């Protein structure tokens, strides 16, 4: 009764449920094992999220207010669990009444005034889509982290400040996050400067980016180096440097 291992509560136990139904039909134990391509073809998808971020900056360039709002659709469920078999016998999915959290909204930064909240978008007719929805791993931190870290870069760019040095201003209380930020920057040979660089004259533009994330007492910093072909818009990731502090491993 093994699934192919789509972690983070994504597989929704389809394989065990299939095995239970089949074994009752034939009166014998039945093993069901999905291959990874099958899992990814039928797995639940992450519900849509909308991230809205605002910040207040004083005359000295200090962030004095941070306002983060996550809005998302709920997960769907049929007969208690969003199983494929439920849909195939005609049961309609029901929308769960909970958000997918707020983590990833920039809480590890020490802003003087900070608000990070999540709101649920009512989903009156979840049966109108053929897609099941569930955690997109984390469960919603991916979108929130992308939004908060991208916005930190936008503020740094607006102030003409290096993105690493800008983040360090608000991490003096957070030793572990400061250390992964510096470790990733040093290992990638990060050079302090405001972003972006002036436009280049060649056919390829180069860029870099840095981002931070935390989850379950784990702290991560990552630097990405990319190239963009100006004519086609094709993006190539040249290198990613990651500093990972996972804390105590038991």
Which functions belong to the PLM regions below?
Residues 1-2, 28-37, 64-69, 163-172, ...:
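Beta-strand segments within the central parallel beta-sheet cores of soluble alpha/beta enzyme folds
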Residues 1-28, 83-109, 135-175, 179, ...:
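Alpha-helical support elements that line or immediately flank enzyme active sites
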Residues 15-19, 38, 72, 195, ...:
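Amphipathic, positively biased hydrophobic alpha-helical segments used for protein targeting
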Residues 24-77, 205-210, 214-220:
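Phosphate/diphosphate-binding loops
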Residues 48-150:
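Glycine-rich loop/linker segments at domain edges
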Residues 70-74, 115, 173, 214-216, ...:
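Glycine-rich beta-alpha junction loops
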Residues 188-195:
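Extended hydrophobic/aromatic segments used for targeting, binding, or gating
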